[in-house]
C-alpha cells in the first residue's frame, strides 16, 4: 500500500526550518569528531534543505514494535521518567526502612516504629558497605575485634605479603541485618564448627594488629580501625567474594593443607599494611589456625550484569515497516579547508566548497509508535533482504512474466549460450535485492577563487570522496538499526 506524503507541509514553515537547522547542527557536530586526513584542516556544514521532491513510501507490514524500542534511555520524557524514578525510589526506601526496623530490633532488643532519613541512610550504607564512623562505633562487637577471617578461611592469612596497603576488616563485628539469612552471618557460621574464642585465640591479639579485608556478599569496602574502634573511610579496597560454608565446619573437616599452595595467590584477598609490625601475632594466629578446623570453600560469585529497564507493552503500540525510495533534490552545503605543503608544510589553506545537490536512496524504514513517542530507523541491506526478500522476489518474478508475455521470443547473446552449455560454469549466485542505502550522492565542488569563469585549482577528488564517505558513515551509524531516532509526538 502506497502513501501520499505532503512533503511541503512537513518541511516548510517554522517547524520545518527548525528541523532543518537541527539536522545541520547534528551533521556539523559529527564532522568535528571525525579524524581528518593530513591535507584537510577543517570541515564545516553551513546549510541544509529538504528540497521539493517527496520520497515514495510503500507499507509492507504492520506489526508489534521491536524489543529494542522498549528500552528506557537517559533521554526519556521528564514526566514519565520522574514517575518511574519516584516509584523505584519509594519502593527501595520502604524496603530499607523495614530492614532498618528489623536491624534495630535484633541489636537493641526492642522495635522502633518509624525511621528518619538519617537512619535510612545509615541502613542503606551498611548494605553497600559505606558505613560511617559514627554508625559503626555505636555497634557492640561479639567479644573483641579479632580476625574472624583467619578462623573462617585458611586462605586469609596474615603472613602473606601486603597486596593493597591501608585497608583492614570489620569482620570482627557482628551486624545482624534483616536481609541476611542465618547461614550468612559470622556468628552462625562459626557456631557450626566450635567457638573461635578458645585457648588458641587470646584477647590480647585485638590490640596487636588489624584485621583482614572482607564484607558480606563481597560488596563492601575495607575500613581501617584503631584502638578506639574509629573507622577511616579514606582507604577503599577491592571487594571480597569469600562466602563461608557452615556445613564444612559442622563436620570438622580441615582443608588447610589443600589450600596452603594457593594462599598467597588468591586475588580476592586484601591485606592490611600493619603485617610488618605484628609478625609475632601473625605467627600466633597461624599456629592457632592450624589447630582449629577452618573452612576452605570459597564461592566466586560474579555480580550480575544490570539489565536494562524495559517499558511495559501496551495494546495500542504498533510498528510500520515500509519501503522508502527517494531520488530528490535535498541540499547540503559544506566547506573544507585544504592545506598545501609546498614550499613548506601547511603553507597555505584553500577553502573548498562542496554542495550536495541530490541523493538517491532505496531502503526499508521502521516507524514504531510507543507512548507518545515515534521511533525511526532503517534496516541494513542484509536485514531488509531477510525481511522482505521473498516478497520482492515474487514481485520481480511477476514483472519478468509480464515482460515475457509482451516479448514471447527474447533474443539471447552468444556469451549466455556458451555459459549454459558449459557444465563447468557455476550457476549464478542469488542477487541481493537491497543494495546500499545511499546509492548515489550528487555533489558540486568549487575551490579557490573563480577567474574568468574557471576555477583556480582542479582535481579535488580526494576531498570529495572523503566528505562523501563521512556522510555515508554518519547516516549508517545514526539511522541504521539498532540505532534509531526518537521523536515526541
From Swiss-Prot:
Gene Ontology MF term list: lipid binding
Please give the residue ranges the record annotates as the region Disordered: 72-97, 201-313, 394-432
- Ranges of Low complexity composition bias in the record: 250-265, 398-424
Composition-biased stretches, type Acidic residues, lie in 72-82
Keywords attached to this entry: Endoplasmic reticulum, Lipid transport, Lipid-binding, Membrane, Mitochondrion, Mitochondrion outer membrane, Transport
For bias kind Polar residues, which ranges apply? Answer: 231-249
Q: How is this protein positioned relative to the membrane?
A: Peripheral membrane protein
Supply the Pfam families for this chain: MMM1
Q: Does the keyword Endoplasmic reticulum apply?
A: yes
The subcellular localization recorded is: Mitochondrion outer membrane; Endoplasmic reticulum membrane
Q: Name one GO biological process term.
A: protein insertion into mitochondrial outer membrane
| Sequence ranges assigned to domain SMP-LTD in this UniProt record | 1-489
List the record's Gene Ontology CC terms alphabetically: endoplasmic reticulum membrane; ERMES complex
Could you say which protein family the record assigns here? Belongs to the MDM12 family.
Its job: Component of the ERMES/MDM complex, which serves as a molecular tether to connect the endoplasmic reticulum (ER) and mitochondria. Components of this complex are involved in the control of mitochondrial shape and protein biogenesis, and function in nonvesicular lipid trafficking between the ER and mitochondria. mdm12 is required for the interaction of the ER-resident membrane protein MMM1 and the outer mitochondrial membrane-resident beta-barrel protein MDM10.
Q: How does it assemble?
A: Component of the ER-mitochondria encounter structure (ERMES) or MDM complex, composed of MMM1, MDM10, mdm12 and MDM34. A MMM1 homodimer associates with one molecule of mdm12 on each side in a pairwise head-to-tail manner, and the SMP-LTD domains of MMM1 and mdm12 generate a continuous hydrophobic tunnel for phospholipid trafficking.
Write out the domain note.
Answer: The SMP-LTD domain is a barrel-like domain that can bind various types of glycerophospholipids in its interior and mediate their transfer between two adjacent bilayers.
Q: Which PANTHER family match?
A: MITOCHONDRIAL DISTRIBUTION AND MORPHOLOGY PROTEIN 12 (PTHR28204:SF1)
* Protein name in the entry: Mitochondrial distribution and morphology protein 12
Gene name linked to the record? mdm12
Amino acid at each position: 500500500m502506497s502513501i501520499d506524503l505532503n512533503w511541503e507541509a512537513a518541511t516548510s514553515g517554522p517547524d520545518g526550518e527548525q528541523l532543518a537547522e537541527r539536522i545541520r547542527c547534528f551533521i556539523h557536530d559529527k564532522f568535528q569528531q571525525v579524524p581528518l586526513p593530513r591535507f584537510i584542516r577543517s570541515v564545516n556544514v553551513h546549510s541544509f534543505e529538504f528540497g521539493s521532491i517527496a520520497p515514495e513510501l510503500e507499507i509492507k507490514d504492520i506489526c508489534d514494535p521491536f524489543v529494542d524500542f522498549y528500552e528506557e534511555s537517559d533521554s526519556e520524557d521528564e514526566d514519565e521518567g520522574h514517575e518511574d524514578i519516584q516509584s523505584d525510589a519509594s519502593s527501595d526506601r520502604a524496603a530499607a526502612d523495614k530492614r532498618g526496623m528489623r536491624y534495630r530490633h535484633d541489636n537493641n532488643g526492642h522495635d522502633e516504629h518509624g525511621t528518619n532519613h538519617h537512619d535510612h541512610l545509615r541502613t542503606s550504607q551498611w548494605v553497600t558497605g559505606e558505613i560511617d564512623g559514627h554508625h559503626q562505633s555505636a555497634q557492640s562487637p561479639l567479644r573483641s575485634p579479632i580476625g574472624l577471617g583467619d578462623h573462617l578461611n585458611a586462605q586469609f592469612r596474615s603472613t602473606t605479603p601486603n597486596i593493597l596497603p591501608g585497608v583492614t576488616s570489620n569482620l570482627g563485628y557482628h551486624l545482624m541485618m534483616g536481609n541476611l539469612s542465618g547461614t550468612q552471618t559470622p556468628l552462625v557460621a562459626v557456631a557450626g564448627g566450635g567457638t573461635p574464642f578458645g585457648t588458641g585465640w587470646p584477647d590480647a591479639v585485638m590490640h596487636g594488629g588489624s584485621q583482614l579485608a572482607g564484607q558480606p556478599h563481597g560488596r563492601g569496602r575495607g575500613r581501617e580501625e584503631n584502638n578506639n574502634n574509629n573507622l577511616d573511610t579514606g582507604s577503599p579496597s577491592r571487594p571480597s567474594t569469600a562466602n563461608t560454608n557452615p556445613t564444612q565446619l559442622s563436620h570438622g573437616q580441615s582443608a588447610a593443607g589443600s589450600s596452603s599452595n594457593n594462599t598467597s595467590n588468591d586475588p580476592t584477598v586484601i591485606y592490611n599494611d600493619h603485617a610488618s609490625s605484628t609478625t609475632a601475632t601473625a605467627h600466633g594466629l597461624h599456629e592457632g589456625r592450624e589447630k582449629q578446623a577452618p573452612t576452605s570453600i570459597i564461592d566466586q560469585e560474579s555480580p550480575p550484569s544490570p539489565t536494562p529497564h524495559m517499558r511495559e507493552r501496551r495494546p495500542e503500540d504498533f510498528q510500520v515497516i515500509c519501503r522508502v525510495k527517494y531520488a530528490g533534490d535535498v541540499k547540503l552545503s559544506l566547506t573544507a579547508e585544504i592545506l598545501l605543503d609546498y614550499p613548506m608544510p601547511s603553507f597555505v589553506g584553500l577553502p573548498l566548497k562542496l554542495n550536495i545537490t541530490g541523493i538517491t536512496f532505496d531502503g526499508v524504514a521502521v516507524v514504531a509508535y510507543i507512548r507518545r513517542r515515534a521511533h525511526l530507523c532503517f534496516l541494513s541491506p542484509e536485514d531488509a533482504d531477510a525481511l522482505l526478500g521473498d516478497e520482492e522476489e515474487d514481485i520481480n518474478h511477476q514483472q519478468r512474466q509480464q515482460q515475457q508475455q509482451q516479448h514471447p521470443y527474447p533474443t539471447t547473446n552468444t556469451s549466455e549460450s556458451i555459459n549454459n552449455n558449459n557444465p563447468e560454469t557455476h550457476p549464478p549466485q542469488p542477487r541481493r535485492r537491497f543494495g546500499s542505502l545511499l546509492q548515489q550522492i550528487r555533489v558540486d565542488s568549487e575551490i579557490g577563487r573563480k577567474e574568468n569563469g574557471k576555477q583556480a585549482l582542479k582535481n579535488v577528488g580526494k576531498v570529495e570522496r572523503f566528505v562523501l564517505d563521512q556522510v555515508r558513515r554518519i547516516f549508517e551509524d545514526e539511522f541504521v538499526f539498532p540505532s534509531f531516532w526518537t521523536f515526541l509526538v
